Amino acid sequence: PLDSWFIRTTALRERMIELNRTIRWKPESTGTGRFGKWLEGLVDWNLSRSRFWGTPLPVWATEDYSEIRCIGSLGELVGEIDKSVAAGLMTENPYKEFVPGDMSKANYDRVDLHRPFVDRIVLVSSKGEPMRREPDLIDVWFDSGAMPYAQLHYPFENGGEKFRTVFPADFIAEGVDQTRG
């Protein structure tokens, strides 16, 4: 068996069941049957996949896994790379020109967080040890959850009031085979 990364979805099971009851499913049996039953039997979600193409997990770890770090933003990653450069684990910060908070295309053209580029980033642990990125990717269903943002290219364009008019989504069309989670 492969090592995997999970999201503790079971901690949210009751809340998701409660919210599922507020959705106007068409047909209704999808929400009470297929999807509702899936929620009732919910298990923790294995969100990692062993592939090359896709969204990389933003997780770095020491070789012995005594320290694991999940990076929450590009600004945080830039700061962590600066620490790694100062510790001598990297020679330069490839994202040093990135300006956190600047949502312009020009700013985001300065970075590529896909493989193989992100795999070249070595962070430094609290003990000065190298931390390498976990090689797995995020399950594409996790990407699908970004639909409300991606449809408007938010926050890079069409933010503010325009975004608020479509979030959260009022209608999502899925094939019945997609309603099992």
Positions of predicted regions on the chain:
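Structured secondary-structure scaffolds
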Residues: 1-181
